[in-house]
Amino acid sequence: MPSVSPAGPSAGAVPNATAVTTVRTNASGLEVPLFHLFARLDEELHGTFPGLWLALMAVHGAIFLAGLVLNGLALYVFCCRTRAKTPSVIYTINLVVTDLLVGLSLPTRFAVYYGARGCLRCAFPHVLGYFLNMHCSILFLTCICVDRYLAIVRPEGSRRCRQPACARAVCAFVWLAAGAVTLSVLGVTGSRPCCRVFALTVLEFLLPLLVISVFTGRIMCALSRPGLLHQGRQRRVRAMQLLLTVLIIFLVCFTPFHARQVAVALWPDMPHHTSLVVYHVAVTLSSLNSCMDPIVYCFVTSGFQATVRGLFGQHGEREPSSGDVVSMHRSSKGSGRHHILSAGPHALTQALANGPEA
């Protein structure tokens, strides 16, 4: 997040995009909110490194096109072609919406730079969309991981909290919390940047990363138990690859931005040009998450693939979902239990591999 030294931008230095420091204008001596600095970072980068700015804008253009197509298709399938709105589907729909928001905010970034430089109102949609997407994406990725853990490892005890109404309440809380955090950060003009950076980094990034890492490890341990049948090996491998891919994408997309926040807070004398370049590269990596989420959570699942093939007139055999497997287990045993682990390794692996259908 951007900051400059107390001397202000007139000192000839490019502002650091870090968490929070006091910024004063030469004319009035008033503190400037961080949002005012975010709105002008493109001008700073273009004036210092025009080639890099053009390259990053080309990448953002590709992200916009790919994200619009993938997320638009995902939103249509999950909202219009998926009848069972399970908790996983609800979390995935909200994740797709956040990715669409950041994609739709990118054209505003081009328009602001070329046609409305210095217009804070014009820059607001992009700045708000970016930070809201980052906060919501982290939280919804965490929700999806926790939901997969409950469905696979704790299906019996989590039956009550894995209801659609509960998932909708969680999503509403995520949107409100992310919006409040985003607006408060953009309006910050105070001091004590180190304390705020560490607090935000722990709450926004390290805590969700810890939850995702621990629950991913627990799920992989459950999938790796010796009793798995041979015919379930292919689905088990696919499920493990999905979990690792989710964790890797989370690290690649969100770690650089938060690591840079902490680095600038601990090293306030970091060269301004270095800080500016690292900030823009980290923002680009974070935006890349908006067109990678549909690939991980939608196209990897067999149910989504079958629906997309049906839309394009290509019919293929669809694997039974985890709900089908559990229902078959109930009818054969007659016990009325939903415990996926007791339904066998094949059902356990499908519960993860079918993702939003479970």
Curated annotation (Swiss-Prot):
Main subcellular location: membrane
Compositionally biased spans, kind Basic residues: 330-339
GO biological process, one term: G protein-coupled receptor signaling pathway
Glycosylation: residue positions: N16, N26
Extracellular side: 1-48, 108-125, 190-196, 260-275
Pfam families recorded: 7tm_1
Membrane topology: Multi-pass membrane protein
InterPro entries cross-referenced by the UniProt entry: GPCR_Rhodpsn, GPCR_Rhodpsn_7TM
Location of the protein in the cell: Cell membrane
Region Disordered, annotated ranges: 315-339
UniProt-recorded Gene Ontology molecular function terms: G protein-coupled receptor activity
Keywords for this protein: Cell membrane, G-protein coupled receptor, Glycoprotein, Membrane, Receptor, Transducer, Transmembrane, Transmembrane helix
TM helices/strands, residue ranges: 49-69, 87-107, 126-146, 169-189, 197-217, 239-259, 276-296
Cytoplasmic compartment segments: 70-86, 147-168, 218-238, 297-358
Superkingdom as given in the UniProt entry: Eukaryota
Tissue expression remark: Ubiquitous with highest levels in intestinal tissues. In the brain detected in thalamus, putamen, and caudate, but not in frontal cortex, pons and hypothalamus.
Gene3D superfamilies for the chain: Rhodopsin 7-helix transmembrane proteins
Any one GO CC term of the record: plasma membrane
Family: Belongs to the G-protein coupled receptor 1 family.
Function: Orphan receptor with constitutive G(i) signaling activity that activate cyclic AMP.
Protein name per its UniProtKB record: G-protein coupled receptor 20
